[in-house]
């Protein structure tokens, strides 16, 4: 999202952003409070946010000089990364927030602007790690010399991110201790699509069998909101668990739910 050739936002280079500020400031039905940007997803360092802050504060200074418009809020958007696999190393939110404040403060001092109220949108960073999806193994297919395909009772209807974004996840055998060595496996769904993949490359025990449970971590962001009833598959329930027990937040869909909107 952080370049010119996208459908989002107003171009700084073409002057569209400053024109949007002018129109908002001139509209009596609007109260212009500040600027917002969004630079991407799964961001693990502050370099991109630093560039965004520099450009936004520069725009705030330009709006003050050219339009006599003062703004008091600066939203640097979302995109803060989380750990889907071992190689992902996100910065803790508290230290990241401190660094972002330092960046904005330095830019404001450079342009002689008062420090605005700074906001970020850590949606994925908050809810992503809070959910684990548990699947039941249906079939296991060994392709000699290549890999093992482990089919589960879900797939792209409850998590389309692997097929859509080539997203990667960590998966673990959840119902017992493994008894065999590890081998390369691909966890796939039950849908009639070759791209219906849950985890593209995973090291799973060779004794994995139908009925085993696989836990896929960090599925709290976007999976449920992007879920569908493709192939007329009901969506699974969402269950909250803590030290005191569990409770259902969203019930499992039924086949009656799938037909509820049919009127013909």
PLM features: what roles do these ranges have?
Residues 1-73, 82, 103, 108:
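Active-site-proximal beta-alpha core segment in soluble small-molecule metabolic enzymes
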Residues 1-3, 39, 49-50, 89-91, ...:
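Short, glycine/charged-enriched secondary-structure capping and boundary segments
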Residues 7, 31-36, 71-75, 115-119, ...:
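Structural preference for beta-strand elements that scaffold enzyme active sites
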Residues 12, 37, 43, 80-84, ...:
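Short, flexible micro-motifs
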Residues 38, 77, 217:
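Conserved residues at the C-terminal ends of beta-strands
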Residues 49, 55-59, 63-67, 72-132:
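Glycine-rich phosphate/ribose-binding loops and adjacent secondary-structure elements
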Residues 99, 105, 113-264:
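Charged (often Lys/Glu-rich) extended helix/loop segments that serve as interaction or gating elements
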